[in-house]
Amino acid sequence: MLPSTSVNSPAQGNGVLSSRDAARHTAGAKRYKYLRRLFRFRQMDFEFAAWQMLYLFTSPQRVYRNFHYRKQTKDQWARDDPAFLVLLSIWLCVSTIGFGFVLDMGFFETIKLLLWVVFIDCVGVGLLISTLMWFISNKYLVKRQSRDYDVEWGYAFDVHLNAFYPLLVILHFIQLFFINHVILTDTFIGYLVGNTLWLVAVGYYIYVTFLGYSALPFLKNTVILLYPFAPLILLYGLSLALGWNFTHTLCSFYKYRVK
């Protein structure tokens, strides 16, 4: 799960890495270690994961500075502790149940919504975006003099999780308090509040994603990851002019999916 690994690794001793060292640095070994820890809650540092979640809102740069520290101490950028993923999953489940309650869904409808949000919105879309960003960053953003390094898929997925968490809290938690009495009232104030929350949430996703890739010293021109802000702001302005309520569309889609 290393985001940067040297293709031409320095030799050790007689010029060949020991089998133990080679295994330790393979993506497969790291993936196995990560998945094994996923079922050992006592080995997870939930306090540190909660700290990261807090700073993703207040100072996301500090989160990625910790990624630098991990690279220096453990020779990997990506998380080796699944505590963040576990807490994110809990947030996702609780907020989705709240969404079902606010939309007056029944028990089985809420379960269907939960399965859809977890396996499609989070896992499916997350795998797609992570793979796309992994391909783009390796294909176009690696510096010419750093061709021996590449962005590993595991780090791309970590960046997605970092960016997804603020979006989740804004759209699946904070927004719940405004849906029935403000956002879905078919008034200008309604879609102004709703669409502004979408603007902030998606904007946060773009910004945290940019910070994640700009933290890698072997990448160049990462500022292009901020370019989606332009169409986002344009879409926001058009939605207000046309009276298009993003949250109303989302709620209608959710209700359609659980029928």
From Swiss-Prot:
Gene Ontology BP annotations: protein localization to cell surface
UniProt keyword annotation of Phosphoprotein present: yes
Lumenal side: 104-115, 185-187, 244-259
UniProt keyword annotation of Transmembrane helix present: yes
Modified residues (Phosphoserine): S6
A Gene Ontology molecular function term of the record: RNA binding
Key words, A-Z: Acetylation, Golgi apparatus, Membrane, Nucleus, Phosphoprotein, RNA-binding, Transmembrane, Transmembrane helix
Subcellular location: Nucleus inner membrane; Golgi apparatus membrane
Source species, domain of life: Eukaryota
Membrane topology (Cytoplasmic): 1-82, 137-163, 209-222
Region (Disordered): 1-22
Modified residues (N-acetylmethionine): M1
Residues that span the membrane, as ranges: 83-103, 116-136, 164-184, 188-208, 223-243
UniProt biased composition (Polar residues): 1-17
Protein topology in the membrane: Multi-pass membrane protein
Record InterPro entries: UNC-50
Gene Ontology CC terms: Golgi membrane; nuclear inner membrane
The protein's role, per its UniProt record: Involved in the cell surface expression of neuronal nicotinic receptors. Binds RNA.
UniProt cross-references to PANTHER family, sorted A to Z: PROTEIN UNC-50 HOMOLOG (PTHR12841:SF6)
Sequence similarity: Belongs to the unc-50 family.
Listed name of the protein: Protein unc-50 homolog
Organism of this sequence: Bos taurus (Bovine)
